[in-house]
Curated annotation (Swiss-Prot):
One of its GO terms (biological process) is trans-translation. It is found in: Cytoplasm. Keywords: Cytoplasm, RNA-binding. One of its GO terms (molecular function) is RNA binding. Belongs to the SmpB family. SUPFAM superfamilies: Small protein B (SmpB) (SSF74982). This is SsrA-binding protein. InterPro entries: SmpB, SsrA-bd_prot, SsrA-bd_prot_CS. Required for rescue of stalled ribosomes mediated by trans-translation. Binds to transfer-messenger RNA (tmRNA), required for stable association of tmRNA with ribosomes. tmRNA and SmpB together mimic tRNA shape, replacing the anticodon stem-loop with SmpB. tmRNA is encoded by the ssrA gene; the 2 termini fold to resemble tRNA(Ala) and it encodes a 'tag peptide', a short internal open reading frame. During trans-translation Ala-aminoacylated tmRNA acts like a tRNA, entering the A-site of stalled ribosomes, displacing the stalled mRNA. The keyword Cytoplasm applies. It comes from Clostridioides difficile (strain 630). GO terms for cellular component: cytosol.
Amino acid sequence: MEQISSKEGEIYMAGKKILATNKRARHEYFIEETYECGIELKGTEVKSIRQGKVNLSDGFASVDNSEVFLKQVHISPYEQGNIFNVDSLRVRKLLLHKHEIRKLIGATTIKGYSLIPLSLYLKNGKVKVEIALAKGKKLYDKRQDMAKKDAQRRIEREMTGKY
């Protein structure tokens, strides 16, 4: 995917304006499958998200009664929202197709799998969430990944040093 940055520091990827990312997710989990889903928001939450005041790092999604909910995602209250602001850690419904929800129900019943948010972005003026079906990494897996990245960096350094 081609990443384009504008003057204001906004990041665009394939027609999407990325508002927030979960950087810890790819370090702590093996990503099996990703889903794009809509999110049910109140008016002041949308304004706050557009300002980039979102924290996805502690968030997760769960399936309850054939509905998917996003939990522990912190959206800061909108400064000019006064009485219209809602709880910053409230549970938010995710909008998916029925067949996708059925797949997620089957997958999350397997031990070790969970649903985590990867990014929050604007697509055609709508706020979308990219969630992933993920399996937690063990400590030795994290060390192995860091060793691979370190070796790759060394190789690149050597290649640029020779030419």
